[in-house]
């Protein structure tokens, strides 16, 4: 193991990030009452250009007037390649309430993108005397973003989370698909006349998880576009959780329960993790570094694996 200790990710639930357009204030109350851990009010793709100033005002007003409870309140600003982003940051932090927790930066391609937002946020916080330190989440949505993923993950101490934006990522990569997440029809191997589908997002997700875990950031899976396909959403979420991601976006309210289900350890998983920890405690007391649990080897690494599940359960109060 390296002498450099791997920093822990923020100790907060991020199982589901529910998105809603800033141009639709009528849904804000319902979002606040949802079971999502994170609320993402959007100023970017879901808001038409002419509606962006009003959407900004809607979010600012909602930050003052809506009871967001224990939700982590995040706002996705416009991309740094647009004329809207700086005004998003300035108005949100000068006029918005202290209830805003996070700014989400889309289409991040390099560390300099994060530096730019961080510098502006820092200046406004100082000028306005804001008490709460704003955190950042970035979205990897391009070939450049995935190529520079580790430097992006290390770009700012404000950075708490990183998501994969599948649709724009696919477009940037030139992928032959119009799907948003999930299995793609033509991405398969053929063996003995039988198709075996693979996951075209796997390598990008794995790169994001590795960069995030190296720098103490929460890795999050992005959207699943077909909100009529519950099993497809669940399958994608299960793959992401197995890789080490902590949560997933919901672009429809019905996806919130699915995400929470997948990213909350089951009672059986928690019970097994606790049994492994107990078995290893017994082994250590007997001077052994490993033992057998249900017919399989468990050792010091198994302790770390089990502790991940137990920590997740404790945060979710399972």
UniProtKB/Swiss-Prot annotation:
Key words of the record: Lyase, Magnesium, Manganese, Metal-binding
EC category: lyase
EC numbers: 4.1.3.24
Cofactors required: Mg(2+); Mn(2+)
One annotated GO biological process: oxaloacetate metabolic process
InterPro entries assigned: Aldolase/citrate-lyase_domain (IPR005000), Citrate_lyase_beta/mcl1/mcl2 (IPR011206), Pyrv/PenolPyrv_kinase-like_dom (IPR015813), Pyrv_kinase-like_dom_sf (IPR040442)
Regulation: In vitro inhibited by EDTA.
Binding residues annotated for Mg(2+), in chain numbering: 141, 168
UniProt-annotated binding residues for substrate: 19, 24, 30, 76, 167-168, 251-252
Catalytic activity: (S)-malyl-CoA = glyoxylate + acetyl-CoA; (2R,3S)-beta-methylmalyl-CoA = propanoyl-CoA + glyoxylate
Pfam short name (any one): HpcH_HpaI
Cofactor binding summary note: Divalent cations such as magnesium or manganese.
GO molecular-function terms, A-Z: L-erythro-3-methylmalyl-CoA lyase activity; magnesium ion binding; malyl-CoA lyase activity; metal ion binding
Cysteines engaged in disulfide bonds, as pairs: none
Oligomeric and partner information: Homohexamer. Dimer of trimers.
Family to which this protein belongs: Belongs to the HpcH/HpaI aldolase family.
Annotated function: Involved in the ethylmalonyl-CoA pathway for acetate assimilation. Catalyzes the reversible condensation of glyoxylate and acetyl-CoA to L-malyl-CoA and the reversible condensation of glyoxylate and propionyl-CoA to beta-methylmalyl-CoA.
Protein name: L-malyl-CoA/beta-methylmalyl-CoA lyase
């Amino acid at each position: 193991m390296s002498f450099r200790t791997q920093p822990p990710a923020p100790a907060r639930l991020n199982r589901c990030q529910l998105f809603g357009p800033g141009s639709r204030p009528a849904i804000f109350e319902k979002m606040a009452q949802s079971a999502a851990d994170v609320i993402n009010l959007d100023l970017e793709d879901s808001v038409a250009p002419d509606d962006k100033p009003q959407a900004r005002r809607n979010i600012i007003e909602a930050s003052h007037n809506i009871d967001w409870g224990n939700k982590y309140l995040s706002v996705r600003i416009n991309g740094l390649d647009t004329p809207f982003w700086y005004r998003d940051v300035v108005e949100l932090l000068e006029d918005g309430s202290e209830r805003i927790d996070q700014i989400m930066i889309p289409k991040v391609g390099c560390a300099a993108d994060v530096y730019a937002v961080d510098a502006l946020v820092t200046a406004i916080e100082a000028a306005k005397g804001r008490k709460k330190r704003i955190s950042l989440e970035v979205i990897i949505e391009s070939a450049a973003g995935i190529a520079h993923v580790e430097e992006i993950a290390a770009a700012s101490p404000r950075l708490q989370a990183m998501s994969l934006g599948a649709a724009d990522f696919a477009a940037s990569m030139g992928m032959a698909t119009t799907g948003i997440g999930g299995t793609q029809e033509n991405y398969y191997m053929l063996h003995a006349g039988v198709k075996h589908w693979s996951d075209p997002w796997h390598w990008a997700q794995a790169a994001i998880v590795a960069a995030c875990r190296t720098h103490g950031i929460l890795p999050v899976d992005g959207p699943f576009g077909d909100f009529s396909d519950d099993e497809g959403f669940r399958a994608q979420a299960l793959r992401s959780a197995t890789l080490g991601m902590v949560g997933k976006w919901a672009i429809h309210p019905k996806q919130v329960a699915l995400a929470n289900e997948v990213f909350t350890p089951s009672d059986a998983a928690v019970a097994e993790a606790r049994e492994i920890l107990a078995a290893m405690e017994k082994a250590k007391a007997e001077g052994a570094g490993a033992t057998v649990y249900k017919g399989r080897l468990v050792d010091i690494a198994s302790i770390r694996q089990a502790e991940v599940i137990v920590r997740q359960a404790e945060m979710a109060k399972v």
